[in-house]
Amino acid sequence: MKEFRTEIKVTPSTQAVQFKTGILTQGSCFSDAIGHRLATYKLRTLVNPFGVIYNPESIHKVLQYGIFNEPVPEHTYLRNSEVFLNYDFHSEFSALKKEDIVSSILNTIGSTHYFLTDAGWLLLTYGTAWVYRRKDTGEIVANCHKLPSDMFTKSLMTADEVSSSFKTFYGQLKKFNPAIKIILTVSPVRHLKDTLELNSVSKSVLRVACHQLATQFEDVEYFPSYEMMLDDLRDYRFYKSDMLHPTEDAEDYIWEKFMERYFSPELKDFVKRWKVILSAIRHKPFHPETASHRQFLLDTLKKLDDLKTQVDVQQEITLVKQQLTKSS
């Protein structure tokens, strides 16, 4: 039968993700989408610890803070409308008192440093090659925090600049954790504020840089989430109403491809078993007091008990026991 779509076929990676592998994700909101799915399936995951960040230079910079475990420079802090923020971080790092945001950032740097010491994988999702520089320092910022536009200059990073920034970061990371492997992705989210034409230019820069880096380093891989959205799914029904962000169905499709490529056979087997348990836990019966539902909960509890030597399922066990108590 003739094929009516251009599906991207993935092959298993030679370096599979194992069960106890630590995975850190950082980058655009697509890093959140993948990271939270990793966490849902009980992998040891640190998801976008520094908040959503779009450009490669800023992504590398916050992770460098994590590697060196040092306070961020004083000149990166700012105050806008009585709120303290930081140019290098997402606005989720904000406070009415400066000492509070400093403490929050330092705690995040410390936890990231600790996680990176033995993490097996780092997933970086680049969102845009467009960057904003402070006019007073010339530094690229992760977030302009709604400050006047005349305080910044906008420019497009070149593929060589992205690669150079990555290589500096890569050298520091590998010195800190020689065993860590890196997955590069380009976010499938479209940046309409740059216009569709310039969004294409930006994504092209990121894609070329990722190709160069994945070709140059054996422990750096490219995962084609961007191409899966544009060339495989290729339909507006897979975009949310803003026509910029992938729907949950699209994210699930890309997630399935991600698992197909990177998960070990043992991990894939666990995912199948965990899906059944998740479905059972989320099930909302019409008549929870029936004997059949009570047996359903007891069966689920047995499945959880069988897995507790592999992963921490105490939260799920507690939840099912609470449901059993209510059904008595």
What are these regions (language model features)?
Residues 1-328:
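Extracellular glycan-modifying ectodomains
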